[in-house]
Amino acid sequence: IKTGTWYWQLTTAGQALSTKPYAVPAIISFLEGRSLVYHSFILKQGIRHLSWVHVDLFNFHWTKRYFKSNKHEKKCYELMDDVIFVSNDAKNKFQQLFNVTTSTKVIYNLIDCKTIVLRANEFKVEKRKFTVCLVGRLVRQKQFDSIIRVARIFVDNGYDIDFWIVGAGCLESDLSKMIHDLHLDDNVHLLGYKPNPYVYIKCADLFVSCSLAEGFSLVVAEALCLGKAIVSTKTVGPVELLGSNSEYGVLADNDDESLYNAIKLFVNDYNKVFVYQDKAAKRSLMFDVEKTMNEIYSIL
């Protein structure tokens, strides 16, 4: 993505915002990229300025299209009083890229395990066989093409497994064609957008995340709340959530063979599913709504 592609389109709107005659206790740009650009135009309208970073910008620098240069993006972050990250690893990768002097803090995403568990029990779905569930937008970052290729490897090796992909997005037609071309219509199922994905995560035997980059991975945290055995590629958020040595879920390198081998561990030995379900339930105790809210209030 070319640096600065959209910056000049944002400038006019940002300058218009800067003329608004009001001041507030705090202004928060809760997403990277465009919202930070707008924020940089309205500094006089707020007393405190906070910006959130949700992703690994070192490995997936999708925001550069909104800035004139990396130096310009760094300057915008250094105009903030605090930059907040959703994981320690996301912060470390950010500093590798920008090395800002601004105050930085880590506050995990708000995860309400009680509500997630309640919603997972709202209704039931049925599975036919060993089932792997994935949830996310059908975009390049999530790498669902990888899991389709992995499914082909399983079929070629005589396994009969279902893969559920819950989500919608711009790559839906491409992924659907790939499934059909690889003769996987009976194994890989694009379920589309579901307002309650937790039911599908709960029903499946294994939850998988095959993303290219994640800052925290909300869906991995939600799968932990549901006590699911988890396989994830080694992106910064899941590594922090699951443990760098796969203490709470199995981490795989970002290639098809590694992902296949990690999933196969559970398919070949269902006892591992039970073991990691127990580990996930224990790990979910790290999520504390009151603690997270107090951390947010403390910086406002």
At which residue positions do the language-model features occur?
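Carbohydrate-associated surface elements
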Residues: 89, 110
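Short hydrophobic beta-strand element within catalytic cores of glycosyltransferases
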Residues: 229-232
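Conserved acidic donor-binding segment of nucleotide-sugar-dependent glycosyltransferases
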Residues: 244-257, 265-270
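Aromatic "clamp/platform" in nucleotide-sugar-dependent glycosyltransferases that forms part
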Residues: 193, 212
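Membrane-proximal helix-turn-helix segments that form the acceptor-binding/catalytic region
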Residues: 14-22, 66-83
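An aromatic- and histidine-rich active-site surface loop
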Residues: 5-17, 25-46
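Nucleotide-activated donor-binding/catalytic signature segment of Leloir-type glycosyltransferases, i.e.
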Residues: 176-192
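A conserved mid-protein helix/loop that constitutes part of the nucleotide-sugar donor-binding site
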Residues: 130, 134-153, 159, 163, ...
